[in-house]
Amino acid sequence: MKDLLSKFNECRRIAYLHTDKDGSFAVKREGEKLTLFFEESNGRNDWINNFRFLAVPTKPYKNMTEGVWFCHRGFDKVWKSIEPYIAKIIYETSITKVDIVGYSHGGAIAQLCYEYIKFNRPDIELSGVGFGAPRVLWGFAGKSVKERFKGFKVIRNGNDLVTHLPPVIFGFRHICEVVKVGKSVGLIQDHTPKRYRKALQEEE
């Protein structure tokens, strides 16, 4: 994993666009490469969506023959408000590489974006990382679903509480690889930007 600290810092300072359903995203283009950023919780509505974790079945993509799965309702709602904006960009044939970055709430949305692009633009060189990202999948995933999330990394600092939510007891689990960094100083403190920066600096 390269440049994690710089990705984290840029994710927190970049200017975001906001949809009418409280989705927050930013797009950075450098030639044939796109970097997509997704913002942490930034208001009351984001927190409401965070706690709307009753699972809903995902809507199949066009030409999908298998691979429907159950998703956190709040995150699915936010992603669906962003999806049309992302679709307009990633279907440009000149785009050959996409990097996706999110923190906290934005890390959940980043996972859904990654899965969407993996299915709809399988020709693209794709990478993704979610710092302190919560779980998005409910139940068990089939082989084709797992394949669409393969390659995305959830970065967990210490024992960051948010990366353990929603709880396994409610049927949620991480479908993406979880990469651990840093030492724990407390469930809540481990989620703070300060602790992530410190842990990522130590990784470099």
Give the ranges of each region predicted by the language model.
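Non-catalytic, mobile gating and regulatory segments of ester bond hydrolases
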Residues: 1-101, 105-204
